[in-house]
Amino acid sequence: MSAPILQIRCLNVAYRSRRGRLRALRDVHLDIPANRIVGIVGESGCGKSTLISTILGLLAPNAEVASGGSIQFDGLDLLKATVADWTRIRGPRIATVFQDPMTSLNPVMSIATQMIDIQYRTSEPAAEKRRRAVEMLDRVGIPDAAVRIDEYAHRFSGGMRQRIAIAMALLMRPSLLIADEPTTALDVTLEAQIVHLLKSLKRELDGSILFVSHNLGLIAELCDEVVVMYAGEVVEHATVRDLFHRPRHPYTRLLLACDPARVAEGGGPLQTIPGGLPDLAALPQGCVFRSRCPDGIDACQAQQPMRPAAADHEVRCVRAVHHG
């Protein structure tokens, strides 16, 4: 794996609640290599959104980040970033595409106005900023971009709005693009188009992408590496080929077995994972997947660290390491 553009070490995040502290992220270590696409998968509640919010410095007021952790980006620990640091980083250096493009698009401003405003840190004249915006819209596949740039968001379909959101995110050529389930609201055809678009833009713009999705098929198609999260922990991290062909963690194997696309290919009933996520306010001792795991042994009662299982493949499971 290549050198990281973003490096997370010993990240622990909890939320204060009436039931106590909800330990949403625990001992997260993660590298996002330069010029790679890293996918994050896991059930709802596994910590994906909290991880993204922490990277972006957008945690809720009731969140607590434990001391001792760090998120290194561009020579700066983002956990210690000031308001001035975030003004320099958010958008120009780390950009985000959200699930709902209307989260990024202002309905009462034309696309041109919004895309020109994004470039406020550059000293170029407005005409040059508009030219760059039109060029980026054209690159993401907006037809008649020079004309349609003056329209408003409601004039575009859902797929076109997501393309515009991607164009806006990439306009300042960020080093890291965070795509938070950007295809969930789109149909299958548009999903495929957005995935193809992200792959081509990643090659052209020479940046990294952190891609969050529930769709394992999209992860397999788009990503170079995959991170599997469960109940606030990273339980497996591998190249996409190795993870899909030889998953090591029991949770990863069960998650892949639940993929409807795999069931359609191989036949047979759709599997489910019994039980549910543990209570983050009262986590069990040892492996947090133990109560749902079909392969549990006595050693699972102790907390397990991430261990190398193969080249570029780590897993948080003592049985997976010893037995493959």
What are these regions (language model features)?
Residues 66-77:
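Conserved ABC transporter NBD signature motif
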Residues 76-77, 127-147, 256-257:
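Conserved ABC ATPase "signature" region
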Residues 78-95, 121, 242-247, 278-284:
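ABC ATPase NBD coupling module
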Residues 171-175:
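A short, proline-enriched helix->beta-strand linker immediately N-terminal to the Walker B motif
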Residues 178, 182, 186-268:
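P-loop NTP-binding/switch modules centered on Walker-like glycine-rich loops
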Residues 239-324:
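Charged, flexible cofactor/metal-binding loops and thiol motifs
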